[in-house]
């Protein structure tokens, strides 16, 4: 049986905790997969491969089928020190940050993309990644100023979908539009002031579309909305507050994906 790492002064703790920060992830070119769901996704994917696993003695038995590399067995206290959450699940892995897809290839190969302008809530981004993967979008594009998709909370909220959905980061809106126009992909601004209603627009949805979503607090800048091919809104009952960004994105992704290719 593997010896158990018990020292809270171990350099392994510092290495893992560094990945809690954007600076640490960039320096190491790695990120964290925490919990059995994320680790399992990492073991099954060709993207973002595992570089090192850490497990507690209990998890060594409980999650034995997930151990694709020789793990370092750690005490509960060491696992707690490594984890970014209060209730560590006994297993985590460091994963390599592979090169992300080329934007032009992504627009060429996709019929349905999502663009998020300066999204800053990691839970929202993780949920959008999960919804996009589950409901049929082919990829996600993030603007500069958006939250890091490799941040621990984003990875957790994606529920493993981070390993499946192609995405690119630090793409200005103008760059996205140029790439989309090359392949006749239409840009669709999702805004509360949109003249077109989603229910009707979906019936005439372009064969290649990228839906543009704004920041949680400020929405989509007018200058971006005006440059889109279409401005669309989600109809709501009078008096209702605007929907959460992740909820809006899920509704749009489902409707658009189902219109392009019915989900079964």
Show which residues each predicted segment covers:
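Active-site/ligand-binding-proximal alpha/beta "capping" segment
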Residues: 189-240
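Acidic/glycine-rich phosphate/pyrophosphate-binding loops and surrounding catalytic core
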Residues: 86, 90-108, 146
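Structured adenosyl-cofactor binding patch, chiefly the S-adenosyl-L-methionine
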Residues: 93, 131-135, 149-162, 222-264
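RNA substrate-binding interface of SAM-dependent RNA methyltransferases
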Residues: 103-195
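Short loop/helix-cap segments at secondary-structure boundaries that form the rim of catalytic
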Residues: 61-68, 105, 222-226
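N-terminal positively charged helical leader segments and presequences
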Residues: 1-86, 186
